[in-house]
Amino acid sequence: MYKRQDRARELTKAFISKDFNHFVRRNYPENLYVVTMTGYEEGIDAHVIFPPTKVKTPIAEYISDLGFKQMHISETEKQMHVTYFFNGGVEKPHVGEDFFIIPSQKVESYASVPQMSSPIIRDEVVRRVKAYDVYNYKFILINFANPDMLGHTGNYDATVRGNEI
């Protein structure tokens, strides 16, 4: 069963959305009863088995309420994980919360660049920690994309190389 909402929503929209126009749907069944594991987003007219649980106070909000500065860093492949998902479904940063997103490389397969943007992320985190008097981060959230993205390639050697930053 697939429970991640970040990719399943596109497929669900292709089946449900009346104004879907990203590709031509042939033999489109008009009378579908669509059930999803989770609620993907407002406006998708599907039945939901497990409605979203509202996170009352995400960690980032709690840290912000304490008056602490924080940084969430990743590359674009995992941007939603250090912003939207970590913040309980909210993309807007809290006071004192900095999002630092590095563009992922445009390649056919990440096996060809197993380090992805990890060295840049590593170096930026080290730079900001060393400059604590400038940034004053009390919390840093880092998501290295390459273990996950390389795991999907099935290329074991590239996955190992990508994790040796």
Predicted features by range, described:
Residues 19-32, 161-165:
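Gly/Ser/Thr-rich active-site loops/lids in small-molecule metabolic enzymes
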Residues 139-143:
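Structural motif
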